[in-house]
Structures are given as C-alpha cells and as structure tokens.
C-alpha cells in the first residue's frame, strides 16, 4: 500500500501467517486453523496466545516469559485473570449472566446489581454505593452516590439532553441547560450553586461549528479558513488571530498566534512521512529547536541531546538525564528502584495510596498531603491539600470543564469555554468577588497549554514541556 507521502506499508501471506511492515515496523502474525491468532513477532520479541479446545484464551505469554492466564466456569464465562502486574482478579455472575462481583488481588470487592432489562441499577465500590435510575425511554435519569455526588438528567421530546446537573460533595453543583436548533446545540447555559455563570452560543455552517459566542456578544472562537483536506487553517479568538499550517499529508507544520503584528506563539513541526514520528519541533520566537530519534519500534530514543533505552518488554531502562530504572521481578512492569544521575528526581519520599479503582486516594510528599474524592464513575471530583495538617486548598472538579477552589489564597472559579481543559481555546475565570474575565489559551499540536493571554492580548503565562510532557 503506497501513500502520496512516499510511505509504503507492505503485507505478505504464507499459509496461516501474515507479515506486515507498517510505519516501518515489521510484524509477523500466525493463526491456527480456527482463525485465532497464536503468535505475534516484532523486533521486541514474540507474544504467544494459547487456547482451550473450545476456543477460549487461557494464556498470553509476552517477551521475557511474562504470562497472563485466564480461568473459566462450566459455562465458559471468565472467572479469573492472573495478571503479573495486578495479581489475581476474580469474577462472579448473577443468574442472568451479568458480572455481579469482581474481587481484586487485595480482596477489594466491587458488586453490581441489574434489573430485568440487564441495566445496571446499583454498584458498590470503593466504600460507595451508587444507584442508577432510568426513564420510560430507557435513558439514564439519575446517578446517586452515597458520598454525596450525583448526576441528574432531563431530556426533551426528541430524547435529546435538556439539562444535566452534577452535584459534588459539600453541596457544590454545576448545571448545564441545552437548547437545540435544527438538530444542533445552539445554546449552552451554565449555572452553579454560587449563581448563573454564562451562556455559550453556537453557530454552524453546513452542520459544522463555525463560531462560539458568550451571551450572544463576545466571540471567543470563530473559524475563518480551512484547507482542501478540511483541516482548520485560520481561527479568530477574541483579539487573537491563529494560523495553522500542514504538510501535504495533513501533518501539522506550524502554529502561529498573533495580537495584531505581535507574535505570541510561533511553533514549527516536522514529521517523518513514513512513520508519522515527530522529527523536530521548534520555538521560532526563541529560535530553539529540539530533535527526536526513534528505534525500530518507533519508541523515543533521543530528545534534545538526551537518550532513552528500553528492554524488550517495553520498560524504560535508562534516561540519560534522569537515571537507570530497575523493575520488580514479580511485577515486571512495576518500577522498583530509580538510580538517579543528578537532581532531576528529587531525593525525597513520595507515598501514594490507591483506592479500589486503582486511583490515587492520598499523595504525601514534603509535608503536603493531597486527598482525592471520586464520584460513582471513578472521576475525580475533589482535592483537599494540607500542609502540616493545615488546609491549604480545596478544589472541586466537574468533568474537566469547571473548577471551583477555595483556600488560603482566596476563592476562584474556572470554566473552560468551547471545550474542556484539554481542548478549549478560552477560559472564564472569576477570582473572589471580582468579575468574570476571559483568558485565551494557546496550545501545542498535542493540546497542551503553552500560553495564557488576556482579552487585551497581553501575555499572562507561558509554559513549556519536555519530550515526556513534563512541565519545565
């Protein structure tokens, strides 16, 4: 298969095996007479798959003889999974065949109850009991957790979402009200326990979003141009103009943000057309370029003059500016020891305790203790931060879109506009009893925030990340 970029993927067949070269990586897959895959071989080694006579998989053996096994009952339902990282996970079923109980290697139990229509109506997990309700149209109507979090949904006559109210712990809540026009969301109104926040207004062109306004006045995002591939090439966000460029294959080559003639962001990118890997990125404002290299599995091996090496199972064994990594023999993907080369890794203890959902419950470091609360879906809804047992900050979260915090520095509300924390072009901020203020966000091609700009075009913050996404 040849592409206009010059990239070429190849496939060859021999009896029950397929050998492919995709993105420059060679791989051979072998199948049994039933069409089940029995092995995959690539430059990292061979992974084998073993089956019972009835076709159920009983084990997977990864490079390094890392083995995961599966057990079943007389009905062919999976009852155990023995994972070298997680330990033994056990499953039990109700009389209708639904998974009713899951027990992890630490003995933590998750229970689920279903109605006669196989809909989940109750879940007990991580010390919480969550009850689910449905309306006559079989749409989710409520999720209520014993820890005080909940979600309430209403719908219009066409079964489109009309309102969504998310209640957090401590009586905090956020409500979204949707208005639909011609099958698209035309308005989205936000309100919280503190008061009304704002309404976003959406305009469409041929069914595609073309503009977002606040309260039918301030334009916070407006599409101005696209290329022949349908990729966005021009956007206005308030006073800022944004220009995006691409190579012939659609890979990004540049992102420029200006306030008039003043350049705020000017980033350049170059990708390998055959593998899709990023060759280099450049901050054209500061004339700083970072080059990247990869191995035959497309893993990052060199970055900004530094190097990384890997074992056959994919574990990082060395980063030249950090140190060497040693892994647990019984849990082969778990780091047991880092031997640092310098000061990149702080020489102090950090303790993390996880809940049943394998999410951090507390993080303790350098006199600080962060405690996290989750809703019935396992999403973070609150962080409490203390230092020397004194509260420094309480921060509440709603779906990566709205945050409220209060602490020694005062209170703050944050609402991401036209998207969430990972995609929004603007953010609405209110500090203390002050007025709501719009800030515009510039991002790199991965979506990480690089610049924060006020509504007058003044730069308020600039951020930079290393090759691993760490703030620097």
Predicted regions and their residues:
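Short, solvent-exposed loop/edge segments of extracellular or virion-exposed proteins
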Residues: 338-342
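Ser/Thr- and Asn-enriched, surface-exposed coil loops between beta-strands
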Residues: 12-18, 184
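Extended, non-globular alpha-helical segments
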Residues: 413-418, 422
């Amino acid at each position: 298969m040849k592409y206009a970029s010059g990239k070429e993927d190849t496939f060859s067949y021999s009896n029950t095996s397929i050998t492919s070269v995709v993105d420059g990586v060679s791989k051979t897959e072998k199948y049994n007479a039933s069409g089940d895959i029995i092995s995959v071989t690539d430059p990292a080694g061979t992974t084998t798959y073993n089956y019972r006579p009835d076709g159920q998989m009983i084990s997977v053996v990864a490079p390094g003889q890392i083995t995961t096994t599966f057990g079943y009952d007389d009905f062919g339902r999976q009852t155990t999974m023995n994972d070298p990282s997680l330990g033994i996970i056990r499953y039990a079923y109700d009389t209708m065949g639904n998974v009713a109980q899951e027990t992890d290697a630490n003995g933590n139990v998750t229970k689920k109850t279903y109605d006669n229509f196989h809909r989940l109506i109750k879940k007990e997990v991580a010390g919480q009991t969550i009850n689910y309700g449905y309306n006559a149209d079989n749409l989710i109507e409520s999720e209520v957790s014993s820890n005080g979090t909940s979600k309430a949904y209403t719908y219009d006559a066409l079964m489109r979402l009309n309102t969504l109210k998310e209640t957090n712990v401590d009586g905090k809540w956020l409500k979204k009200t949707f208005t639909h026009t011609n099958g698209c969301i035309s308005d989205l109104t936000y309100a919280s326990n503190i008061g009304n926040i704002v309404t976003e207004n959406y305009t469409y062109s041929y069914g595609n979003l073309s503009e977002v306004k606040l309260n039918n006045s301030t334009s916070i995002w407006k599409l101005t141009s696209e290329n022949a591939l349908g990729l966005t090439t021009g956007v206005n966000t308030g006073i800022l103009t944004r220009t995006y460029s691409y190579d012939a294959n659609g890979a990004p080559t540049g992102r420029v943000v200006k306030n008039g003639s003043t350049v705020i962001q000017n980033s350049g990118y170059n990708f390998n057309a055959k593998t899709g890997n990023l060759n280099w990125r450049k901050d054209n404002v500061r004339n700083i370029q970072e080059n990247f290299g990869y191995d035959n599995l497309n893993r990052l091996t060199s970055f900004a003059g530094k190097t990384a090496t890997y074992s056959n199972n994919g574990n990082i064994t060395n980063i030249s500016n950090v140190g060497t990594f040693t892994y647990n023999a019984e849990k082969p993907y778990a780091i047991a020891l880092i031997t640092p080369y310098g000061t990149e890794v702080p020489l102090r203890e950090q303790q993390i305790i996880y809940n049943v959902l394998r999410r951090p419950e507390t993080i303790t470091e350098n006199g600080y203790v962060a405690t996290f609360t989750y809703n019935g879906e396992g999403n973070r809804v609150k962080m409490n931060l203390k230092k020397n047992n004194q509260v420094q900050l309480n921060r509440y979260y709603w779906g990566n879109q709205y945050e409220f915090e209060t602490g020694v520095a005062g209170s703050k509300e944050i609402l991401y506009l036209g998207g969430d924390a990972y995609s929004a072009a603007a953010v609405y901020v209110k500090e203390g009893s002050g007025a709501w203020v719009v800030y515009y966000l510039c991002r790199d091609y991965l979506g990480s925030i690089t610049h924060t700009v006020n509504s007058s075009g003044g730069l308020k913050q600039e951020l930079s990340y290393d090759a691993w996404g760490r703030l620097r």
